Amino acid sequence: MQISELYGSDNELYQRLISSIGFGIHVALPCVVQSYDADKQTIEAQPTIRERTIELNGIVKYVQYPLLINVPILFQQVGGYIISFPIKKGDECLVIFSDLSIDNWWLKGNVQNPVEIRRHDLSDGIAIFGLKNQEKLSLEKTKPSANCLSLLNTETGNAIEISEEGIKFNTTKYTTTIDSIVARLNNHEERIAALEEIVG
């Protein structure tokens, strides 16, 4: 059988060749956490989109990506400070894939040579958290406000909200603000001063 019979025109052959090369280059994939190692700060993550492949006979198949293991996680940290989160199984994330092998850098830090020549490989993923699909968003009990900076637990509704109006604390038991706390402290200090005056 001639190649032209299998693939059609030369243009189609080149398009298939380009596509086959692209299958080996990975940029980013949404994933779901399967496990989390808090000591190493790595996760095992399952990609949530299947790869579309075309066999030589023209049959289209969708293939599940393998489990990604030892994926470093990205927490916001700088200058000795870090914002961390309690990652758990089922959390979603976006895994991006490095231009080069990150193994030596991950183990030793500083500037390193790659252990092997590979680009955008599934072995060189880094997980970024915060991405969610619409289905999961629709199931959340509480959503962050669009008018403030918030630290929010979407399951309980507990939150710290910072806006132009001030800082507000919301919990399942009560809601208060910084101004209210200061007022209570001042009132408490006034009571202590009054008692000291009476006793003294």
PLM-predicted stretches and their roles:
Residues 2-7, 157-200:
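Intrinsic-disorder/coil detector with helix-boundary
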Residues 2-167:
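Hydrophobic packing positions characteristic
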